Amino acid sequence: MNSSSPISIDLIAEILSRVPSKSVARFRCVSKPWASMIRRPYFTELFLTRSSPKPCILFATVADGVWSFFSLPQYPYEKSSSASVAASAKFHVKFPPNNMRIGHNSDRRYFSYGYTSGLIYLYGDSSDDRSVICNPYTGEYAILPYLQRYRKTYSFLVFEPIEKQFKILFMAYLSGDRDHKILTVGTGNMKWRTIRCSLRYEIVSEGVSINGVLYYLGETSAWDNKDYDLKYDYAIVCFDIRSEKFIFFEIERFCRLINYKGKLAVIYFEDDVNYQSCLYRKKNYVEPDAINKLNVWVLEDVEKQEW
């Protein structure tokens, strides 16, 4: 009688989630089931949770198109302690491999990188650049299907927490009814699909993803959105990652979107400060004697638009 039994894949995942990232990268070569397990979003989440006893800050440096990824322990703030804490950064991996070009535009308005749930998205805005998804801990990556671009583009890496799927939302400028595309990462044959968005706008903010919904700010003043009775020049775009549907609601001024305790919040200055010019033109438009007030509004209900 054979008393031995195979180790379950869940137990293997539990064990591997506690080993160093370089070892995880090598374990992909053990077998196809192991390689498949390590690629799953579930394992990425588990590894980020179990591999370190303390929360970590992930950061990267870029030199000559090569990204170097590091992590740093995040120590809790102690108000009563005056002693400084010294910590050394842990190097993980360099990316991309040799002979692969990834464009990196230094202008934040082109959104040339994104991060969510343990994966990093890198893309360039020219036709020669390759778009990739990278695991900064193991160095594993996937090259995304080519998408023809002849206009300025925007895209976001998002994570759908129920089905645990990574998706990429892509938009071309000027954004029209058929200028939005979606790709589900990790499927056997990754393909871009066209999704419809009836509102025309230009993206003027970074994206904020909260509980399966992606939020970003759109400027609508340059287009005649005749199907909408718009009173203001800006709208917050809400993209449901699971259903792949858009909803919109107007906002009377330019603002910055943030995640505030698990809810969407907007912040903006009043009076003498042109915040949009300061943030996106990278110039100091603030007069020395400027009077301003910082406003913070938290969205309590998306459907009712209650703040």
Curated annotation (Swiss-Prot):
Domain F-box positions: 2-49
SUPFAM superfamilies listed in its UniProt record: F-box domain
Domain of life the protein comes from: Eukaryota
InterPro entries: F-box-assoc_dom_typ3 (IPR013187), F-box-assoc_interact_dom (IPR017451), F-box-like_dom_sf (IPR036047), F-box_dom (IPR001810)
Protein name: F-box protein At2g23160
